[in-house]
Amino acid sequence: MGKWRAVAALLLRNQLLNSSKRLNLSSSPCVSKHPTIGLASRFLNFRHFSAFPSPISIYNNDSDSGSNDAYQNYEFGTEAEEALGKIPIKAYFLSTSIDLKAMQAENLCNVVPPTSRSTNYIALKFSDFTPSGIYSLDERESVSNCKFMVVFQYGSAILFNVDDNDVDRYLDIVRRHASGLLTEMRKDDYAVKEKPLLIEEMKGGPDYIVLKTLDTNSIRIIGSVLGQSIALDYSVSQVNKLVEEFADINRSMAKTGTFTMTRKKLFQLVGKANSNIADVILKVGLFERSEIAWREARYAQIYEYLREEYEISQRFGDLDYKLKFIEHNIHFLQEVMQNRQSDLLEWCIIFLLAIENAIGIYEIVRESAGASL
């Protein structure tokens, strides 16, 4: 009976291999048109049915024999297994403004159709081919075979599945439509991994997130939080410079006991502080919840997890505390300037009164001299 089972398995294998040669990939911007052997390989992994139970498993895992260990190990693998299949994410903050309309017009064939009414970002999709040009059905259906770039109007660009050697080529697309380019870009790294057999919709890990399903909306959600985080990081660095500048002013006042800053310089510091808080709240939209996250709970879960992971609220709280310190110093320095102006006006008034008294004395002396004559 075992021989007949082996012959039947061999015939089934040959039939599947022959039928797979007639299959072609459907047209997609991210896959080539080479024939696929993915369907055959998937069928070959099915168990050959028999009336007699087999004494040993012919599978690499024990899921078919009734054991749940395979599913448990699938979720919690070794470090090597966890690193396998990760899609790298690179977040950049390279300018203070990006013309999204011009960028969209130039890369129209790569634009991912929007799923929300938000106009402060665009998502671009680029093809990615394997060296052999052969894909399985699972690979064709996954967005992990494409490169994505999510660009935000306030200056952030998030790259998905882009190698380090290709980063500059993608960022050049952004630079052509950017204004206020920074001399030194801000950068952050993250990763995402797709596990269709994951029990939950998502699971967090060290410096990466595991999703049950990775789609373009997930990419948008991840990009929005990372874009806000890297922009917030830039704003914090700018505010830190202002704090250090005011600290130098206070140290100088402690040593000399005088305040020598000009009114123009103080107004410039006030403008920098106000523009930083306005950019974070209005342009970056730090407190504006994504429309995609409003519609579906699984995207909301990703959104909330990443905001907690990147400590968005806590970091903004620290930024707000530093801005309040700056605001307190500005009010103090303004009072010092006003007092200095008041002192100057008082001295001017005293000088004018002295002149008036001198003129009065002169007239009295002159009248007295005329009367004596």
UniProtKB/Swiss-Prot annotation:
Keyword Lipoprotein: no
Disruption phenotype: Reduced number of dividing cells and slower rate of cell production and endoreduplication, thus affecting root meristem size and delaying postembryonic root growth. Decreased expression of several cell cycle genes indicating a defect in cell cycle progression. Extensive vacuolization in mitochondria.
GO biological process: regulation of cell division; regulation of DNA endoreduplication; regulation of root meristem growth
Residues annotated as transmembrane: 346-362
Alphabetized UniProt keyword annotations: Cell cycle, Membrane, Mitochondrion, Transit peptide, Transmembrane, Transmembrane helix
Gene Ontology annotations for the cellular component aspect, listed alphabetically: mitochondrial membrane; mitochondrion
InterPro entries attached to this UniProt entry: DUF155, RMD1/Sad1-interacting
Topological relation to the membrane, as annotated: Single-pass membrane protein
Tissue-specific expression: Predominantly expressed in the root meristem, in the primary and lateral root tips. Also present in leaves and pollen.
Effect of residue 346 to K: In rrg-1; shorter root due to a reduced number of dividing cells affecting postembryonic root meristem size
Compartments reported by the entry: Mitochondrion membrane; Mitochondrion
Targeting presequence: 1-49
Pfam families, per database record: DUF155
Similarity comment text for this entry: Belongs to the RMD1/sif2 family.
Role of this protein: Required for the maintenance of mitochondrial structure. Positive regulator of cell division and endoreduplication but negative regulator of cell expansion in the postembryonic root meristem, thus leading to the promotion of root growth.
Matches recorded under PANTHER family: PROTEIN RETARDED ROOT GROWTH, MITOCHONDRIAL, REQUIRED FOR MEIOTIC NUCLEAR DIVISION PROTEIN 1 HOMOLOG
Protein name, as recorded: Protein RETARDED ROOT GROWTH, mitochondrial
Source organism of this protein record: Arabidopsis thaliana
